């Protein structure tokens, strides 16, 4: 397991790096005192979870010996790595001017420029022992996150999770949906008294819908549309793609089609989840 320690000058992108690491499955803690690193590692060791911790100028130890002692007390299951983010002085000044945030070392008697220089001196012991130093001066937020994924995972894309969810329009459109498809125009099993109490997960309902060409056409055209744009979506710094399929009540057509799409992309090796809002409400 990896214990990734993220440090660097304020404004260099530590928060961005921590979010990217969290997306990669790391358990992330912001600004944890160095002396607590061994305790955190021991807590996570039994759970087999890699961790990432940010350390800034406000919680660096008073002496390098304290940091070394904390590293020596880590459980053997963890491999510590120190990532140090930096940027040139003018870039840091510009970023602070753009965000209008206060530098951690700023005070009435210390200008932003002086605070940046002082911070650089205080962080030099960490910088000197870093396993990886990244200059973010010319990087965007997305480029930094992508670079970290490439270095740590060995591939350019992180795995996108495709979520197919069914819903009923009478209950409202899901607010987390990236795409919404309306299937209320398709043949409705609701009007068959035998099928009405069933759901799109039941075989008789599936057989009913499977008999209609327009259902097959809709599924084919929808999955073709998603396949066309999926490569770009996978490289667009997102963790989830939520596709919502809606019918009137969210019980028959939308459930069946959401499952069909989920099964198709799952068979193509994609990371897929499916959920059915109306059916979940009925269980509670």
UniProtKB/Swiss-Prot annotation:
Keyword Transferase: no
Gene3D superfamilies: P-loop containing nucleotide triphosphate hydrolases
Residues annotated for GTP binding in this entry: 56-59
GO function term, MF aspect, one: ATP binding
Family to which the UniProt record says this protein belongs: Belongs to the RapZ-like family. RapZ subfamily.
Function (record text): Modulates the synthesis of GlmS, by affecting the processing and stability of the regulatory small RNA GlmZ. When glucosamine-6-phosphate (GlcN6P) concentrations are high in the cell, RapZ binds GlmZ and targets it to cleavage by RNase E. Consequently, GlmZ is inactivated and unable to activate GlmS synthesis. Under low GlcN6P concentrations, RapZ is sequestered and inactivated by an other regulatory small RNA, GlmY, preventing GlmZ degradation and leading to synthesis of GlmS.
Protein name: RNase adapter protein RapZ
Species of the source: Salmonella typhi
Organism phylogeny: Bacteria, Pseudomonadati, Pseudomonadota, Gammaproteobacteria, Enterobacterales
